[in-house]
């Protein structure tokens, strides 16, 4: 049988138009990454936080793949442009939505469905032979984002059980869709109706593109300072050391009760770190893209850790979530300096957590907790090592010697505040605390980890 190749040369997009469209797509992928990341700490449901971590990393990877194709098309690798100021205003409007349902509607019923539809149209309309890399890429991105849409629809169905809730969600959706149509969609060229099988585009002229010039709108995302992330009941926060001691016990031995207390406290660190990675992605777009991609990867890791640690507490250790308080360390995440946010959390706390997990693993192998706990500790420790390396490498790269000394001074003050909370009047201070970006490697093995978390 002869091979029949039904593909034909020719498409609706030149190399220049192709790259402009990919730049528009990359802008929206990054906007979605920043929105979900920045909303995470004000979203109470742990299941939503965890899924946001997955989706944030998906959008970051999508943006990175688009950057690779942009470079191949002789365009700037990190180019990401809104088609026009009206589309940027739409994204700003979505960012400022306050309720969880409204945010989910905006992302999973309006923006991502539109993006998937546009990807499919572009893949169908471009040259299938000369532009095969773009076709393959857009089919891949459409599949990833379509999986997000399915999750979002299921969640919205569960959150809008009452008729008035569904009507309100539909009203929000209609308003956003109207704004989307008015601004011309992600490309500014209108909403393509490629799914109408009977409609022929053969005689239609190629869509025109308006040059937005250098005045296209850009906006900065900022999150209001909070005392702690939003969490759903039964989780709660306390700044009273006595409550922590009474719920968890002062001496956490490697027993079933001891491991239960350890992992319940660790869960807070996983939640906070998921939230803080997302917040950094939203608030610091000026950071190098390679660094932001690593931050998104860490957010995904921490989101997985939420699932792992919560499951360990409930299913492996027989505990109830929320039986003990979480600490109030979120004030560090209100710092205007992104490197300060990483200094204590990644370059001190996560380094200490690596040691803690190594000790837990050895104790679990020897005690009743069993090999399952030991294996999980080993996997968690492997992830933490990458998070420590991330911050260490980037602080050394971005901060000169004087700034690193300032980070050490600030970091020691922050560590003293944290350790002093648990140690009380007997605390001797944090003047000898080391951080991993310090030129000696930050080694302070003589100090025992006094805090569980990140």
Identify the role of each PLM range.
Residues 2-454:
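Non-heme di-metal
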């Amino acid at each position: 049988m002869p091979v029949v190749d039904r593909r034909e040369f020719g498409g609706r997009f030149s190399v220049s138009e192709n790259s402009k469209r990919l730049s528009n797509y990359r802008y929206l992928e990054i906007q979605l990454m920043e929105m979900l990341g920045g909303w995470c700490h004000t979203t109470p449901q742990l299941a939503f936080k965890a899924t946001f971590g997955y989706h944030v990393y998906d959008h970051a990877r999508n943006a990175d793949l688009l950057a690779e194709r942009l470079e191949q098309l002789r365009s700037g690798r990190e180019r990401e442009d809104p088609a026009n100021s009206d589309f940027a205003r739409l994204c700003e409007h979505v960012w400022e939505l306050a309720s969880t349902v409204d945010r989910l509607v905006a992302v999973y019923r309006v923006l991502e469905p539109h993006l998937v539809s546009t990807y499919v149209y572009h893949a169908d309309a471009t040259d299938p032979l000369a532009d095969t890399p773009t076709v393959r890429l857009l089919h891949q991105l459409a599949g990833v984002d379509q999986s997000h849409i399915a999750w979002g629809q299921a969640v919205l169905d569960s959150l809008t059980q009452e008729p008035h809730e569904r009507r309100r969600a539909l009203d929000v959706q209609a308003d956003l869709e109207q704004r989307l149509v008015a601004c011309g969609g992600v490309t500014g060229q209108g909403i393509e109706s490629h799914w109408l099988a009977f409609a022929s585009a053969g005689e239609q002229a190629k869509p025109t593109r308006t040059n937005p010039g250098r005045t296209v709108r850009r906006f900065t995302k900022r999150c209001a300072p909070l005392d702690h992330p939003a969490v759903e009941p039964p989780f709660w926060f306390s700044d009273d050391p006595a409550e922590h001691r009474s719920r968890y016990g002062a001496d956490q031995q490697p027993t079933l009760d001891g491991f239960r207390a350890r992992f319940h406290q660790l869960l807070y660190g996983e939640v906070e770190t998921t939230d803080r990675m997302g917040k950094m992605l939203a608030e610091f777009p000026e950071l190098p893209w390679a660094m932001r991609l690593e931050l998104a990867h860490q957010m995904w890791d921490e989101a997985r850790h939420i699932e792992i640690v919560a499951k360990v507490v409930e299913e492996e250790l027989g505990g109830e979530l929320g039986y003990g308080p979480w600490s109030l360390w979120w004030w560090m995440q209100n710092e205007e300096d992104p490197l300060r946010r990483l200094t204590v959390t990644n370059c001190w706390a996560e380094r200490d957590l690596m040691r803690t997990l190594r000790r837990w693993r050895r104790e679990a192998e020897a005690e009743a907790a069993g090999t399952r706990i030991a294996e999980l500790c080993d996997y968690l420790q492997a992830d933490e090592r990458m998070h420590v390396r991330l911050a260490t490498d980037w602080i050394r790269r971005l901060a000169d010697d004087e700034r690193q000394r300032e980070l050490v001074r600030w970091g020691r003050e922050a560590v003293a505040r944290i350790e002093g909370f648990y140690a009380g009047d007997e605390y001797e201070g944090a003047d000898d605390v080391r951080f991993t970006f310090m030129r000696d490697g930050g080694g302070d093995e003589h100090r025992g980890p006094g805090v569980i978390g990140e």
